[in-house]
């Protein structure tokens, strides 16, 4: 059975209305240049405009690769821990979420894992899929790959167009090959949207 290689990336930098900025397009363009050497089979993207625009920019570098929307990749909170397990620093973040919203977020997160965090069904060669999504979805997939408790998605940050690669094999647990790699970006395009204090 073949292996699945998931190339997870957060959309390029977006403005306050969720539209890709010029910087975001440049970030996506540079990532496209990096990925044009990889045998990508498909590009999947969130339905939100910033992810769609990132996919369109990336697709110019991968002209023969199909591009499709995947609803599971939409930006959402994948899991809300019980109140006693929420770190003090995160408590305000979950204010206003009710049980229905929490259940819907968990349903989407479970569907994301069921659809993409598996070995390919076909016994053919390895598959290479790009998922253009959002920080929380990347954190959830990394948490799942590491078999960490559900609340450990909190605090796993992904920068715009940073690359995270997870490999799924039939006989071993998933392998996180790289996390939040920005080597394709010059220093001024890294960590966009993050406070200067955390930029290494």
Where are these regions (language model features)?
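Mobile, glycine- and charge-enriched loop segments
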Residues: 1-21
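Internal catalytic-core helix/loop-beta-alpha segment
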Residues: 94-126
């Amino acid at each position: 059975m073949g292996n699945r290689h998931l190339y997870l990336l957060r959309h390029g930098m977006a403005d306050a209305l969720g539209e890709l900025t010029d910087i975001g397009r440049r970030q996506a363009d540079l990532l496209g240049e990096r990925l044009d050497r990889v045998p990508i089979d498909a590009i999947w993207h969130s339905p939100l405009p910033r992810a769609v625009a990132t996919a369109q920019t990336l697709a110019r570098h991968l002209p023969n690769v199909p591009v499709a929307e995947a609803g599971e990749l939409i930006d959402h909170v994948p899991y809300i821990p019980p109140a006693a397990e929420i770190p003090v620093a995160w408590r305000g973040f979950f204010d206003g979420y009710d049980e229905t919203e929490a259940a819907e977020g968990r349903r989407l997160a479970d569907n994301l894992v069921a659809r993409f965090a598996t070995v390919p069904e076909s016994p053919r060669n390895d598959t290479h899929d790009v998922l253009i999504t959002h920080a929380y979805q990347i954190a959830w997939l990394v948490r799942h790959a590491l078999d960490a408790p559900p609340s450990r998605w909190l605090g796993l940050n992904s920068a715009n167009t940073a690359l995270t690669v997870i490999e799924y094999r039939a006989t071993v647990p998933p392998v996180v090959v790289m996390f939040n790699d920005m080597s394709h970006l010059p220093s001024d395009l890294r960590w966009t949207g993050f406070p200067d204090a955390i930029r290494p």
